[in-house]
Swiss-Prot record:
Its cofactor is Fe cation. Its EC number is 1.13.11.5. This is Homogentisate 1,2-dioxygenase. One of its GO terms (cellular component) is cytoplasm. It comes from the Bacteria. The gene is hmgA. GO terms for biological process: L-phenylalanine catabolic process; tyrosine catabolic process. It comes from Nitrobacter hamburgensis (strain DSM 10229 / NCIMB 13809 / X14).
Amino acid sequence: MNTSFDPVAANSNSANVTPGYMSGFGNSFETEALPGALPIGRNSPQRCAYGLYAEQLSGSPFTAPRGANERSWLYRIRPSVRHSGHFVKIDAKLWRTAPCLEHDMPLAQLRWDPTPIPEDELTFVQSVRTMTTAGDAHTQTGMAAHIYLITRSMVDQHFYNADGEMLFVPQGGSLRFVTEFGVIDTEPGEIAVIPRGVKFRVEIPSGPARGYLCENYGGAFTLPERGPIGANCLANSRDFLTPVAAYEDDDKPTELFVKWGGALWSTALPHSPIDVVAWHGNYAPYKYDLRTFSPIGAIGFDHPDPSIFTVLTSPSEIAGTANIDFVIFPERWVVAENTFRPPWYHMNVMSEFMGLIYGVYDAKPQGFVPGGISLHNCMLPHGPDREAFDHASNTELKPVKLTGTLAFMFETRFPQRVTEYAATSDALQDDYADCWQGLERRFDPTRP
């Protein structure tokens, strides 16, 4: 077997990037694991070097505007038509797809404790548990929010998702994504995005892993517009990392899983599909370290809208209304004067799925712990609990740095419907709404 997964795998164009990765967001990258594997000045020569096949992977229609047109050319040992066979529909376990109406959506604010890592041996595909779905995968709108609880690496197994793009948010344990485009390593504090149609397997190099997964049925994630903020801050393009080419020349039988049409399918292959020796284009997986996010905040007074913490956005057909926004609440200085500093009380047309990667969330110091989840659906009120309100209302307003904390939110324009699994989970807190019961009447018309 000839395997080229050395972290210093050859990159023909950038000698100064981090070994194994190329820097930038949405760039037209090019990389080769063998010298001369990439054709020069053309995409599909009559005969490719090393006896490779040229294949295009399109993430957008051919006629999409240039700025939104996504595609990559892959030079591989076998074309993808040899990576498919007789597909058999199999049990998707607890993985669900929108629209999913298996449970009446409770009209309530909801919160879950962390789900324990199971003792069973579960690969990535087996470990996915869907918490909420929104929109309709068949019309390429909306999303699903999942958790994963992986206890075993995928061995002689691979997967791709035809229904959506996948954004992984590790919370405990590291993940290695062995993809057609190269290898991505992630740990808590980082994210990985795997585009629709990209084949990969998930390995757990440091043991069992738990985290969150957003399945994006709509437009691909992109960087938000900065507007008056200007040319810098938030998530900067140079901090996104795309892998250099790496391949397997392996004739060992493997199983390929495909998520398509809301179902899970399987086929047997006589070889590894991770056989791309070189590639070029702008449609590829990537990773991002959330700790490089440069936050913007109030330096005078008032609490700004949480949209200033948007890392990535999946746009909809309505300008400024996201199919999904991926938002984080990172370490930052809080300095606003004469201001209630935590997030304010709120009712929102958007639906908010929140998770906590590590630390303490300032609006919910109790009950919302790392690995946990909260769901505040469209037009359901939410905000700080009694403890957070009392502290923020009475504390001395000096500059404070929020350290050791990282929360996130999947926010969508669609109501998020709770799955049967989520609604019946032992992790569901039946007393979440009680956190606001201590907010007593404080009104006194005689005291301005």
